């Protein structure tokens, strides 16, 4: 990493990364230098600091000074909040922390299972939705049959004036009463009333068909959802395939690193190409100069100069 890193064991502050901190070299005064080394080589830290001799490359960050900076009054580092490399490691968690954490995880899993069971109970089963659909189908068929019979009756009345259309029965047992179109040909007003009655009957049958379709609509949607199972995602970066957000971020960072490396390589290749072109131009110029000198030598030789 560029910049200076603090030489205190366990302290990784860096001048390039931590811009707000100050970094100091070891003092040249022998007494101050001894105090700095004594405090930096604190109790419990041994090894490299037993024979540590600071050089011009060693730096000490301002975190280890009272007030966060070395001054005329604060000249010796005395604050070392970080553990040294060889200090005794103290357990960060109490003895029963692991057991309590396991119990908490088990409780969370049980709560999640209960929530899933409640959701499953609230959702309607496929068998009940199928049964409701089959119950609504006869009503739809009967309404459709009523409309068809009414239309047929109107056509028959137009073809044979004065005839009587017989009463029909739908498959569900509902009586569909056709319109009595028995009128006298000479009464135009009676014929107009019969046509109006036929139109009103047709509208009533159409309204019944639409009501049956509206009632059936949500059930058909449920059946349609069951008929198209989820096939899963087509790529490995989808969250539904079990990939976590951390893995996605890691993969994206890897892709960004690869792209950055490719950009660096491309810049290097462009520089190499530019350098080769310059070299080629120089070689061509040298070749022209040699050809010119050779031609002049040939001319001089011919003329005996």
UniProtKB/Swiss-Prot annotation:
* GO-annotated molecular function: DNA binding; DNA-binding transcription activator activity, RNA polymerase II-specific; DNA-binding transcription repressor activity, RNA polymerase II-specific; RNA polymerase II cis-regulatory region sequence-specific DNA binding; RNA polymerase II transcription regulatory region sequence-specific DNA binding; zinc ion binding
Q: Which domain of life is it from?
A: Eukaryota
Q: Where is the motif (HCFC1-binding motif (HBM))?
A: 234-237
Which tissues is it found in, per the record?
Mainly expressed in embryonic pluripotent cells. In adult tissues, expressed in oocytes and in certain regions of the brain,including hippocampus, olfactory bulb and Purkinje cells.
Q: Where in the cell is it found?
A: Nucleus; Cytoplasm
Keywords, in A-Z order: Activator, Coiled coil, Cytoplasm, DNA-binding, Metal-binding, Nucleus, Repressor, Transcription, Transcription regulation, Zinc, Zinc-finger
Q: Which residues form a coiled coil?
A: 246-296
Major site of localization recorded for this protein: nucleus
The record's listing under Pfam families reads: THAP
Outcome of gene disruption: Embryonic lethal; embryos die around the time of implantation.
Name of the molecule in the record? THAP domain-containing protein 11
Q: Which species does this protein come from? A: Mus musculus
Gene from which the chain derives: Thap11
């Amino acid at each position: 990493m560029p910049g200076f890193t603090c030489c205190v064991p366990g302290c990784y502050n860096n001048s390039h990364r931590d811009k707000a901190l100050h970094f100091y070299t070891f003092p040249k005064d022998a007494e101050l230098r001894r105090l700095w080394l004594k405090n930096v080589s604190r109790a419990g830290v041994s090894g490299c600091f037993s024979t540590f001799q600071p050089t011009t490359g060693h730096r000490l960050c301002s975190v280890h000074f009272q007030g966060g900076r070395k001054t005329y009054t604060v000249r010796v580092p005395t604050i070392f909040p970080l553990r040294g490399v060889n200090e005794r490691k103290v357990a960060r968690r109490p003895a029963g922390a692991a057991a309590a954490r396991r119990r908490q995880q088990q409780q969370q899993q049980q709560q999640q299972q209960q929530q899933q069971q409640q959701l499953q109970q609230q959702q309607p089963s496929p068998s009940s939705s199928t049964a409701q659909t089959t119950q609504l189908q006869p009503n739809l068929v009967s309404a459709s049959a009523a409309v068809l019979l009414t239309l047929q009756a109107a056509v028959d009345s137009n073809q044979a004036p004065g005839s009587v259309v017989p009463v029909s029965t739908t498959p569900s047992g509902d009586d569909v009463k056709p319109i009595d179109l028995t009128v006298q040909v000479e009464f135009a007003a009676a014929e107009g009333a019969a046509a109006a009655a036929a139109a009103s009957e047709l509208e009533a049958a159409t309204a019944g068909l639409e009501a049956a379709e509206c009632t059936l609509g949500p059930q058909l949607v449920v059946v349609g959802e069951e008929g198209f199972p989820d096939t899963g995602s087509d790529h490995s970066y989808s969250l539904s395939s079990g990939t976590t957000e951390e893995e996605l971020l890691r993969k994206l960072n890897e892709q960004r690193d690869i792209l950055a490396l490719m950009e660096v390589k491309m810049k290097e290749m462009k520089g190499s190409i530019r350098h080769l072109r310059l070299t080629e131009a120089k070689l061509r110029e040298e070749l022209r100069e040699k050809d010119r000198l050779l031609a002049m030598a040939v001319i001089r030789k011919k003329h005996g100069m």
